[in-house]
UniProtKB/Swiss-Prot annotation:
Residues annotated to bind substrate: 89-93, 143, 185, 212
Organism: Caenorhabditis briggsae
Enzyme class, broadest EC rank: transferase
Name under which the protein is recorded: Queuine tRNA-ribosyltransferase catalytic subunit
Any one GO MF annotation of this record: metal ion binding
Region feature (RNA binding): 243-249, 267-271
Taxonomy of the source species: Eukaryota, Metazoa, Ecdysozoa, Nematoda, Chromadorea
PANTHER family with a match to the protein in the record: QUEUINE TRNA-RIBOSYLTRANSFERASE CATALYTIC SUBUNIT 1
Listed cofactors: Zn(2+)
Disulfide bonding pattern of the chain: none
Amino acid sequence: MKYDVLARAGFARRGNLHLPHSIVETPVFMPVGTQGTMKGVVTEQLVAMDCRILLCNTYHLGHRPGHERVKAAGGIHKMMNWNRSILTDSGGFQMVSLSKLMTVDENGVNFESPHTGEMMALPPEKSIEIQQALGADIMMQLDHVIHVLTTGDIVKEAMHRSIRWLDRCKVAHTRDDQAMFPILQGGLNLDLRKECAEEMAKRAKVGIAIGGLSGGEEKDHFWRVVAACCAALPPHLPRYVMGVGFPVDLVICSFLGADMFDCVYPTRTARFGTAMVRRGGLMQLNQKRYKEDFLPIDDKCKCNTCKNYTRAYIHSIAGKETVACHLVSIHNIKHQLDLMRDVRQAIQSNSVEKFLRQFLFDYYGPIQSENPSKQDTEKVQEVPQWVRDAVDHMGYTLDF
């Protein structure tokens, strides 16, 4: 794996990540196919959107269908008919999401399967064994993940344990064709984050992840941790902020210096009939206001949904037919990929401030209406203070 920085603008970088299955342009959003499948989307559709990399979940694939079966099928790429890049997480996040089903000690994590009730031991070495069998382009170390709002000695303990587990993962990592990222921990404590960044940087060869965020912390804490971590990490390695998927978060983190992101948000929110749009942020298509709205979700979007279907049609089937989830998922994933394309272009052309002003004005403004005169009278929402503070930290100003 090789990472080339092609352009810089402020803290932000535009780069190319050279992986065995594709060249990934950064900053990049990675859709999540938890068990080797995207909710409501097939791989051919992802290729049509020019998605270059996606994420699969080691814990869930290890349980079902099992990493031995995936390996027997020729690896995760062949099994899911995907010839582009894949990143697998380590299973560490399930320490939070499945906290009632697990225990953790120095040896590793012990999970109870939510599917069968069977116990599964996951030491760092086993996490790497599973990920090597899956065959992803990028693997993650097993880290000790705690809830982001946790306080006390456990925060420091989990951070140091993550460093020790990284050393064990490095010994277990034997495949040269798979990159492995350390994961930076430390909660909301900036001093611990910087200490962890220093230790992880000594051990990192190809990239570093920033973990333990997007778990309900205040946004003011969120962006400051991302900014501090990016500033403390080596400039030649890609920085991956795990679990980030809200459009504003993607934009802000990219311009703070982060390069990679993942989240289930585009497909999860689609299940509730919620579409992501540049003008107005979120569109709740199950609301009655869209009953006779014959515009596409976004008239500037080139996804198959926006080319062929109206808001009124999706409203009529939202919550009733699975195809509604499929159509909105297609749009939401394309929205995120296009947003990151525009972020890269802003960095390349050194027009970040101009992009920020337009993006935030549109995002916190009104949703596009069939009645332009009514839309013109609506006022933009207040941009959150945390966003303004982050933009100010970058050295840019908003003119509204």
